[in-house]
């Protein structure tokens, strides 16, 4: 394989029994059975291999090596007496003739167990990132990213797009966030900016006659961290098409994205083509957002006809919108906090009521709803343990 190893730690099989081999990796675990018998697990990028030391000298050598030290093992492959069907290498083990320490781990105790690194706090994981990345679960995320990017490149190329890398150091062109600035050494007092997106460059390409462009583009924005991205930078599939309509762009993405999500997605929830089209007005009226998360089955309903004339002052002369929440079993404290949060975000004061276990309207504005209970229950499909949150808004038109 290479001059330093003949096989990887995930490669050996029963058909290799009797072969003289050399593997390299990290000492993952050591189990001592006695002074002349010990089992070690050596791990590399590709998997793990069990090493069996059967002499006092070899056991003593393994005991002197701290876990996660880098070692090489030269020995002979043999069939295991006790096989592990859960491992690709579970039918074999290696009897070492020589073990060499290539890089010694200086500490007996690690900052966290490798296979549980995600349980450690973020600062510790980042400080010992080289250990965190040895966790198979973390490593597999990096591999998944590589596979998705490769699939995107292949799909875009098949659709006639050229991958063109655009400049990183550029002039400032504010696009909604703050720029990252880089001092220009030869021009004191002047700065380069890191691009928030390659917008101007891809437009330049189109005016230059290039027909279809894409890249896995780094974007830099000096903004606070979010739950789904690191502070400052992220990567996106950036694309541009000449002489194209909105539907032309949709058609490309409907071909490119569903197969990738179907192949690499954790859940089988990839949208099939054609993608659902939601007009802006409908999105705002039904979901209260121009980018609704359709996985959340909570829609806004216009109940002005039901509650606009129920006698409750704030509803009179206003549009009344409602959200029905099913399987609701929270405390009054939770309801009050939620409504307070909604008021801060929306600027309007929300009200609530629910159908209790006896089928009665209770809570909030219940006394105004009780006289029209049957109409409300029928129109909104209310069932026991459903909470109904209503909010008046001024009459307005969305165009």
Q: What are the residue ranges of the model-derived segments?
A:
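Class II aminoacyl-tRNA synthetase catalytic cores and aaRS-like
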Residues: 1-390, 394
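N-terminal low-complexity segments that are often proline-rich with Ser/Thr-Pro
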Residues: 395-399
């Amino acid at each position: 394989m290479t001059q330093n190893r003949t096989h990887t730690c995930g490669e050996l099989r029963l058909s290799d029994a009797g072969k003289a081999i050399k593997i390299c990796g990290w000492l993952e675990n050591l189990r001592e059975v006695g002074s002349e018998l010990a089992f070690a697990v050596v791990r590399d990028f590709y998997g793990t291999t069990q090493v069996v030391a059967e002499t006092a000298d070899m056991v003593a050598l393994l005991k002197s090596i701290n876990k996660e030290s880098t070692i090489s093992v030269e020995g002979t492959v043999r069939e295991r007496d006790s096989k592990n069907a859960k491992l690709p290498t579970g039918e074999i083990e290696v009897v070492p003739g020589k073990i060499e320490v290539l890089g010694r781990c200086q500490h007996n105790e690690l900052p966290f167990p490798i296979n549980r690194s995600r349980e450690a706090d973020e600062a510790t994981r980042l400080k010992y990132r080289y250990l965190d990345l040895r966790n198979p679960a973390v490593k597999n995320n990096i591999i998944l990213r590589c596979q998705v990017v490769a699939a995107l490149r292949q799909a875009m190329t098949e659709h006639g797009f050229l991958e063109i890398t655009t400049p990183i150091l550029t002039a400032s062109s504010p696009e909604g966030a703050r720029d990252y600035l880089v001092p220009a050494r030869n021009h004191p007092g002047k700065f380069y900016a890191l691009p928030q997106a390659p917008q101007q460059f891809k437009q330049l390409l189109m005016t230059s006659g290039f027909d279809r462009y894409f890249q896995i583009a780094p974007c830099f924005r000096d903004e606070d961290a979010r739950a789904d991205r690191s502070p400052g930078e992220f990567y996106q599939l950036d694309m541009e098409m000449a002489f194209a309509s909105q539907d032309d762009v949709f058609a490309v993405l409907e071909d490119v994205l569903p197969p990738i999500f179907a192949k690499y997605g954790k859940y089988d929830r990839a949208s099939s083509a054609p993608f659902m089209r939601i007009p802006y007005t409908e999105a705002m009226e039904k979901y209260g957002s121009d980018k609704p998360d359709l996985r959340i089955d909570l829609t806004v309903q216009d109940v002005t006809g039901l509650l606009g004339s129920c006698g409750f002052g704030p509803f009179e002369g206003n549009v009344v919108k409602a959200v029905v929440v099913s399987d609701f079993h929270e405390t009054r404290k939770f309801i009050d906090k939620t409504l307070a949060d909604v008021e801060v975000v929306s600027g309007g004061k929300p009200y609530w009521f629910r159908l209790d276990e006896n089928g009665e309207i209770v809570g909030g504005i219940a006394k105004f709803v009780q006289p029209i209970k049957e109409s409300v229950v029928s129109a909104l499909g209310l069932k026991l343990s459903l909470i109904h949150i209503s909010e008046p808004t001024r009459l307005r038109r969305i165009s």
